[in-house]
Amino acid sequence: MDLKNLTQEERSELSLIDVAHFILEQRKETILFPELVKEIQAFLGLKDAEIRERLVQFYTDMNIDGNFISLGNNTWGLRAWYPMDAIDEEVQTQTTPKKKRKSDDDEDEDEEILDDDVDYDDEEIVEELGEEEISLADVLLDEDEDDDDHLPDGIEGDLATVEDDYTDGDYTEDPEDK
């Protein structure tokens, strides 16, 4: 269908997607999204405010429609131009490999030491740092000496302390509990 021969009234009934597809078919090359929007605006005779209102939906429709493909950097084309195997190659950015620097000493590369290859002696490290060894019993004793065990006066201070009658380990069942 040739859209160039349509009247302005017929053009206003076209969707932005249809016009975008027509423009890309006519150009036969990729186009930046802002340029595509300007061409659509000129073709349909839309005002800036009108195109801004429809822009978000148009971009969404282009992403959803299977006829268009984004090639990165906001460049769009028709999916029909690209065979399936070439799409991945076209979309990927071209990077140039870094040039290797020449080193004066090639032996350094061969003697790379990994952390897995090194055995660390923990006792030597402790001696070097001058740290003292701490036993678990010392840590547990320090925790028992905290001041958090004392309740402040107030509501907590008014509470009665309930003592456990069976703390000595000689627990026998009370015949009345049965």
From Swiss-Prot:
<feature type="compositionally biased region" description="Acidic residues">
    <location>
        <begin position="161"/>
        <end position="178"/>
    </location>
</feature>
<dbReference type="GO" id="GO:0006355">
    <property type="term" value="P:regulation of DNA-templated transcription"/>
</dbReference>
<protein>
    <recommendedName>
        <fullName>Probable DNA-directed RNA polymerase subunit delta</fullName>
    </recommendedName>
</protein>
<comment type="subunit">
    <text>RNAP is composed of a core of 2 alpha, a beta and a beta' subunits. The core is associated with a delta subunit and one of several sigma factors.</text>
</comment>
<dbReference type="InterPro" id="IPR038087">
    <property type="entry name" value="RNAP_delta_N_dom_sf"/>
</dbReference>
<dbReference type="GO" id="GO:0003899">
    <property type="term" value="F:DNA-directed RNA polymerase activity"/>
</dbReference>
<keyword id="KW-0240">DNA-directed RNA polymerase</keyword>
<dbReference type="InterPro" id="IPR029757">
    <property type="entry name" value="RpoE"/>
</dbReference>
<comment type="function">
    <text>Participates in both the initiation and recycling phases of transcription. In the presence of the delta subunit, RNAP displays an increased specificity of transcription, a decreased affinity for nucleic acids, and an increased efficiency of RNA synthesis because of enhanced recycling.</text>
</comment>
<feature type="region of interest" description="Disordered">
    <location>
        <begin position="88"/>
        <end position="122"/>
    </location>
</feature>
<dbReference type="GO" id="GO:0006351">
    <property type="term" value="P:DNA-templated transcription"/>
</dbReference>
<dbReference type="InterPro" id="IPR007759">
    <property type="entry name" value="Asxl_HARE-HTH"/>
</dbReference>
<keyword id="KW-0548">Nucleotidyltransferase</keyword>
<feature type="domain" description="HTH HARE-type">
    <location>
        <begin position="14"/>
        <end position="81"/>
    </location>
</feature>
<dbReference type="GO" id="GO:0000428">
    <property type="term" value="C:DNA-directed RNA polymerase complex"/>
</dbReference>
<keyword id="KW-0804">Transcription</keyword>
<dbReference type="Pfam" id="PF05066">
    <property type="entry name" value="HARE-HTH"/>
</dbReference>
<comment type="similarity">
    <text>Belongs to the RpoE family.</text>
</comment>
<feature type="compositionally biased region" description="Acidic residues">
    <location>
        <begin position="105"/>
        <end position="122"/>
    </location>
</feature>
<feature type="compositionally biased region" description="Acidic residues">
    <location>
        <begin position="141"/>
        <end position="150"/>
    </location>
</feature>
<keyword id="KW-0808">Transferase</keyword>
<feature type="region of interest" description="Disordered">
    <location>
        <begin position="141"/>
        <end position="178"/>
    </location>
</feature>
